[in-house]
Regions:
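NAD(P)+-binding Rossmann beta1-loop-alpha1 motif at the extreme N-terminus of oxidoreductases
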Residues: 1-26
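Active-site-lining helix/loop region of Rossmann-like oxidoreductase modules
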Residues: 3, 7, 11, 141-260
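Short, ordered loop/turn segments at secondary-structure junctions
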Residues: 33, 70, 95-98, 127-128, ...
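Conserved N-terminal Rossmann-fold NAD(P) cofactor-binding segment
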Residues: 34-60
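Adenosine-phosphate binding glycine-rich loop
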Residues: 118-147, 154
């Protein structure tokens, strides 16, 4: 029987735990940073502080750690590094972790080498894996000639966790969106490369998928740019995910356009 622990017990964990249990896996540990839920139980398993994860992973020795916390690779690096060091498989909904090699190559290479050294798998998966990645590569494999691949996808950030909502700029004024999100892309190619090499680049979710697709299809990327455009609504919207009312005219999310 596969034994698993859950790292991050927010909205997405409700589904990952359910799916794992439905597949016959055994739930042996849970971790979070939220003081309001630490000490409570999920399916009879007590949620422990995230700070105790390393010690408990050494004790529990699960087969896999499911990580559902943040969207940026640098924000899940510590727990992935712990898992890789201990030889524990880890799978995460962190969108950048699907293909971090074109946005955080130094950190990705460190985790990759450590996982191979200790004979375990560290991977990112989720919506983009199935529908933006493998579905497209499968269709491409059955196509005689491809000149361009164009795609568009939309989803409700309210259905996901706070990390995704914040990464999309939901709840920001348009000025805040411009300063904190959109302006980050108004840089030269040289400046972008420096940010990427330092691990400070903020990729939209499609950035990593485009890199994955090019790698999968054997293509060499000569240039890649992204632009993030705020989306708004004509009326106030209450967000339980953000625990706030997103006022009329504020950003409800964004449209991320990546061209490779």
């Amino acid at each position: 029987m596969i034994r698993f622990v859950q790292y991050g017990c927010g909205k997405m964990s409700k589904y990952t735990i359910q799916y794992a249990l439905e597949k016959g896996m055994k739930f042996v540990g849970a971790f979070d940073i939220n003081e309001d839920i630490i000490g409570t139980t999920i399916k009879g398993v007590e949620i422990r502080p995230a700070s105790e994860a390393e010690a408990m992973l050494k004790e529990l020795r699960p087969d896999v750690c499911i990580v559902t916390t943040m969207s940026l690779f640098k924000d899940v690096y510590d727990i992935l590094n712990i898992c890789a060091s201990l030889g524990i498989n880890a799978i995460t909904t962190c969108e950048e972790a699907f293909y971090p090699f074109n946005s955080a190559p130094v950190l990705a290479d460190e985790i990759d080498k450590l996982a191979k050294k200790n004979n375990c798998t560290i991977t990112g998966s989720g919506y983009q894996d199935a529908f933006w990645g493998n579905l497209i590569s499968t269709l491409a494999g059955a196509t005689d000639k491809i000149e361009k691949i164009c795609g568009s996808s939309s989803y409700n950030v309210e259905d996901y966790g706070i990390a995704l909502a914040q990464a999309h700029g939901a709840g920001l004024t348009l000025d805040e969106f411009e300063k904190n999100i959109a302006s980050i892309d108004n840089i030269s190619e040289e400046e972008r490369k420096k940010l990427i090499n330092k691990g400070d680049f903020l990729p939209s979710y499609m950035w990593n998928v485009n890199g994955w697709l090019c790698d999968k299809l054997g293509l060499t990327v000569t240039s890649q740019v992204q632009k993030c455009v705020p989306q708004t609504h004509s009326e106030d919207i209450n967000s339980t995910t953000l625990n706030m009312t997103v006022k009329k005219g504020m950003a409800t999310g964004m449209s991320a356009v990546v061209t490779t």
